[in-house]
Amino acid sequence: MAGLAEQGGDAALPADAAERSRLAALLRSPRVLGTLALVYAALPALLREGGDGASRLRTLAAAGALLGAIPALALARRLARPLRMATLLGGSILGALLCVTVVARAMGGAPRMADLVSLPLLFPALAFGAAVTLLLTALGAADEDRETLPVAAALALSAIGVVPVASAIGRDSASGWFVGMTLYWMLGGGTLVLLALAASRCLPRHVDRLTSAVGHGALRIPERWFVWGAALLALLAAAAITVLCFARQPHNADEVAQLWHARILLEGRLSLPVDPNPEFFGMDNVIDRGRWYSQFPIGGPAFLALGLALRVAWLVNPLLLALTIPNVHAFARRAYGSGTARAAVLLLLASPFALFMSASYMNHVPVLWLVSVALAQLAVWHEADDRGTAIRSAALMGLALGTAAAVRPLDAAIVASVMGVMQLTHVRHSAVRARSLVVQVVAGAMPVGLLLLANWRTTGAPLRFGYDVLYGSAHQLGFHADPYGTQHTPLRALVFASKYLLELDVALLESPLPAVAVIVAGLFVMRRTSRWDKLLLALVAAQLVTYALYWHEGEFRGPRFLYSALPAFVLLVARAPFLVAAATRGTMRRAALLVLPLAVVAGWSAWTLEASPVGRLRMYLGASPMTRLDPAKIEREAALRNALVFVSESWEAQSLRRLWALHIDRGDALRMLASTHPCAMRQAILDEERTPARQEGRLARIEATLKSYDPLATPSEACIADLLSDGEGVATYAPFFPSNTIEPDGRVGGNVVYVLDLGAHNEVLRTRFGDRAWYRFGPHLRRGDPLPTLTPYDRSGARDSAGTTR
């Protein structure tokens, strides 16, 4: 009996061991680990106490855990397998605590050790650390056959492009819109993922037939028809947006300044002599000291001048977007194959960011096209096995990047640096390619030489740009006081980088899926990177870091400072479904191929949502009619002949222009106007305008007047009248300024001259324009009218130098 018992016990041991082995295997399975990661990531949300401050702590802890995992991952790969999870966990927790500590100190706080081990911080740090560790373990990120680069890139992009760091650190309204978008992504994106999984699980054959039919159908279209058909659709879509939403008019100071400079170029000049009355033509980003021209490099205005010569300046950027599509396809086809290339073309065609930005006069669009040319030729150069092909592609690359430098030098330097490093690592294997680099440099030097010549003729020095003329050294990259007196710090740079990616989450697709999260998903499952993957990631990183170091926040219909890297972002998004499908099987594989197309279709089908392409169209169409003012139409309908039109802007805008006319720097003018009492500023301007020749010490005198003003004193009747004058109706000078005609002598003239309304100071123009019919554009006929009106000029409505009406 004892023997039987012993035999029974011995027989039971393997069964128990097998059970334990199965349990261990289950706990190590990617699905279980991934589920646990989601659970741990959601746990900090259970801590509701602490309000907004605790929410910021949780956000920073999440970002820190992701960033801390990057060095921990590099270390874990070198350790034995049992130590890897502990290393990842320790690195993630330490990263969370360090992130909160560093940010708190940068914001002026002084966290103590007791704060670091308190529940509101320690619990999120532990939970997010565990979540990141479980996720990386589920993905096998520390395995020997995995590269660290794609996972590290995914962690970094997640930390600042998915986790809303900008909302946690910034002091603006970024958090409001992102909270709404997060809810939209969780509900909309979550629903799409569940639908894709359900369809893939319940109807696998139907899903396979659908994806196969769509894929093969797209590939059956002849390449030329597919590419140029997409280009034509992009041209028509962008042109329609330009006409319907924006009335072919400029909508910010950058567009206005470059259109004006384009008119100057069209007259065969690089600049104009300064107008005798510059205060009446004051415009941001326009230089009117020594010579009259814009702050922008000559290339952007040159592109617009070509359009002005054909009377279709508004069509230049839509056309350049259309020409970008064949280049993106050519690069992607050589780098990744026809499937990814066609997916990238469709994504670029459906991207609201690409379409709305190209429906403008901004110089980012020419650079996008030139970068796409360089990328397409880089792929050709890389495959070239004969001297002629290598030299031809190198010459085109150099010409494209050199021309880009004449438009946006910083963007061109970023792209040229990244591409140059890749080329230098490749020329070792080919003497033909090595010699072609000389041709590339020479070709690039030609447009750069024209840029330097234009600088010399305008600013007085080849390496001095218009930006430096307006803002001096405060315009440069780095951490310093910006032209408006705000310190650009590493923390502010981090906020900018995060905000650009968060804006790209929305703008790139305007769909239930955040764009950066799609890229992250693809990177997490990428086992090895090709040279082209490294190139795209380097372009994204270089563009993001460089513009984070720039003091000005670039937002215009999306994160415009990332627009030059749009091909890289689009290709990374287009690659993601294929990467996830290749790394999975069965239901997950089918769902991976469904989710992104469903999201794009859902975005364009969401007619009632503001966060959609159609919602954006509706917003622009419903904007104030002021945004679609057409000076040519106003001139035609009013039958103006030999006229002078005073455009009445707000009192604040008038004050800014008058400060510029007094030779106050743009930054100082805006800083003083934003921080002082309007009546104090009015008095300071009047005092200086009485002695216009006393330029020396002017800024100090104005600041002394502003400091001496008593804000509790009763404002003068004249000041109150000035401030109330805005209620009579105001307009914007922006669309009118570039509509002026330049005479052969370099002076403003033509049938109609548009100037700023500066009140009684307008009378100084009697000698110069006294033979013209005078009008004022600004007052409303009736209160509540949506548009200003054009009325004959009434001298009795002007205010004299003391501010009283006469």
Give the positions of each predicted feature.
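Membrane-lumen/periplasm interface segments of multi-pass, membrane-embedded glycan/lipid transferases
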Residues: G3-E6, E19-L26, P44-L66, A104-L126, ...
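Hydrophobic, aromatic-rich transmembrane alpha-helices
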Residues: A65-L79, F128-A142, L197, L323-P326, ...
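Transmembrane alpha-helix segments characteristic
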Residues: G91-L98, A153-G161, W228-A239, L348, ...
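Signature aromatic-anchored transmembrane alpha helix within multi-pass, membrane-resident enzymes
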Residues: E223-W228, V441-A445, G449, L571, ...
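Transmembrane-helix motifs of polytopic, lipid-linked glycan transferases
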Residues: W314-Y336, V373, Q377
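Transmembrane-helix signature of polytopic, membrane-embedded enzymes
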Residues: I325-P352, L368-W369, D386-R392, L396, ...
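Perimembrane helix-loop-helix junctions
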Residues: Q377-I391, A413-V448, L452
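Membrane-interface helix-loop-helix junctions at transmembrane boundaries of multi-pass membrane enzymes
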Residues: R387-I391, H426-V441, I519-V540, E553, ...
